[in-house]
From Swiss-Prot:
Species whose genome carries this gene: Sinorhizobium medicae (strain WSM419) (Ensifer medicae)
UniProt-listed HAMAP family: Homoser_kinase_2 (MF_00301)
Source organism, top-level taxon: Bacteria
Lineage, opening ranks: Bacteria, Pseudomonadati, Pseudomonadota, Alphaproteobacteria, Hyphomicrobiales
One Pfam family it belongs to: APH
Protein name: Homoserine kinase
Keyword Transcription regulation: no
SUPFAM superfamilies per UniProt: Protein kinase-like (PK-like)
EC number: 2.7.1.39
Amino acid sequence: MAVYTDITEDELIRFLAAYEVGSLTSYKGIAEGVENSNFLLHTTRGAYILTLYEKRVNADDLPFFLGLMHHLAQRGLSCPLPLPRADGKLLGTLSGRPAAVISFLEGMWLRKPEAQHCREVGRALALMHQASEGFRLKRPNALSVEGWRPLWRNSEARADEVQAGLKDEIATELAFLEEHWPRALPEGVIHADLFPDNVFFLGDRLSGLIDFYFACNDFLAYDIAICLNSWCFEKDGSYNITKGMALLSGYESVRNLTAEEVEALPLLARGSALRFFLTRLYDWLTTPPGALVVKKDPLEYLTKIRFHRAIVSSAEYGLRREEASA
């Protein structure tokens, strides 16, 4: 979450008049994240999240995102829900941008997740994959392998400003992944951004998943790869196999991976690392000064790309199944 667009109190009061949320008592911007402008609202009826959808979010995708949250909640997954306006619509307009008021989910994200939390995340991810079955809307993953080269072109010329030799290394990496990317694995709706700041806990109990604005249709195992990258590396860049084992066993407590998914996991993890490297690199080079947003270091994901290049078997991630050692 982030803030790119400021709003005035008068604007917000007029906007909230279309919702049954009571009277505004306070609001503040939320700086974490990089995609939309988000505010925590307090009213006489409780707490809510206000989201203004910025230019990277295609307004045509919003019915998919909001509909998915509704679908998942109906099937028992704990996630935020968009509130309807007086006219029944889920979207309004504020400061020239599509905007929605979302229910507030209790809990906090963990700054230092441990293995037990990784197991909970793996299990919740599998439950989300199950709960999304039957959701009829479709959204291709614009940030999968077909989208990486256009994204790379936006940063390629300046890549060596971040680290010498980066331009050539990433060009080689991208070409390899384009050639070897899997073509046939189990598919469904994936979260595609299940980082620690998008998972809430109350104590050690997972209380819900948030921020579905990258959700799309893609390989289910690609979602697992994203989680391995975002949950199982330590700050020094080392991979914590205990966390990896916990996350994978948590996932497989609900849904077992196929042999093809097990074989593809190292490549999916490598591609996932490149995807987040590329978006971080673009934001690092182009985020306007003064934006209330936390820029994230792309080199963190360069370290992960290099780690995954050396992986031979999914067993090295902590997957303890016969197929992983084949």
